[in-house]
């Protein structure tokens, strides 16, 4: 188990040694709060785009189902006739230049796995750059857009925003409620009181704290051909190799179990790069991975490898609320 994995386990399950990190946590909180205060007190330090910007992010380290929800937001806006673009940091990407416009045919190493997945699924204009304000400017120079979604970037205050959506894993919550490195929080818990909406992945119902959304499996897709298979493609009890290089791989393995399969889990680091040798497992069984991993494995995937396609399903109340926000932000287009 890596140091990062040990830390995550301690954050969510508790460990007395975390108290030794309290001085570093205090320093981290002071830096984060001072940085945020600087941007709030001087609006000139942030770039405000000529179109509304919606930030979709986390205050916790690790996976919360952000990419599926961004896909839902994109498709929902597109169904309403809105021209939507996306900016992303492009984590682990090595583009030839910055900012970099992501195309569906680009290799994952140029784009990052999540931006490439988003473009391949939706065709949306997407620009990557750690400087998200610069990414927005570049995107608007190329495309006439009505709305921009920022994939993550809640803490990137150089980009002014009109709406902040924060996602939390309902099962793990905020862990021990402490900031890095003593806990999983990028910002103090009080930050949740300042955002526009909180969404809980896996919650049974809406609460006063926020809206519920779920990730529902819709089918399997073969990597080598793109053929779609129904969820009953494998019978109940089928043993298979399960590959996940995401922030919370256990959630993927649990999902496969809810489909009555018997996954042999193979967890990799978030945003991991793969080689064919890494994915040679024994015994020979069907292999199922996440869609995020699939964009990096299509080039060498043999017949039979597939990914589980999921879709975000937000609560009716959130859909109504979000439509109201779109009408407020874009009154001429509603």
From Swiss-Prot:
- Key words of the record: ATP-binding, Kinase, Lipid A biosynthesis, Lipid biosynthesis, Lipid metabolism, Nucleotide-binding, Transferase
Positions of disulphide bridges: none
GO CC annotation:
plasma membrane
Could you tell me which Pfam families the record lists for this protein?
LpxK (PF02606)
Per the record's keyword annotation, is Membrane included, yes or no? Answer: no
Q: Which domain of life is it from?
A: Bacteria
Which reactions fall under this protein's catalytic activity? a lipid A disaccharide + ATP = a lipid IVA + ADP + H(+)
Q: In which pathway does it act?
A: Glycolipid biosynthesis; lipid IV(A) biosynthesis; lipid IV(A) from (3R)-3-hydroxytetradecanoyl-[acyl-carrier-protein] and UDP-N-acetyl-alpha-D-glucosamine: step 6/6
GO biological process, alphabetically ordered: lipid A biosynthetic process; lipopolysaccharide core region biosynthetic process
Q: What is its EC number?
A: 2.7.1.130
Positions bound to ATP? 60-67
Q: What class of enzyme is it?
A: transferase
Q: Name one GO molecular function term.
A: tetraacyldisaccharide 4'-kinase activity
What biological function has been recorded for the protein in this entry? Transfers the gamma-phosphate of ATP to the 4'-position of a tetraacyldisaccharide 1-phosphate intermediate (termed DS-1-P) to form tetraacyldisaccharide 1,4'-bis-phosphate (lipid IVA).
Record-stated family: Belongs to the LpxK family.
The record's section on HAMAP family has: LpxK
Q: What is this protein called?
A: Tetraacyldisaccharide 4'-kinase
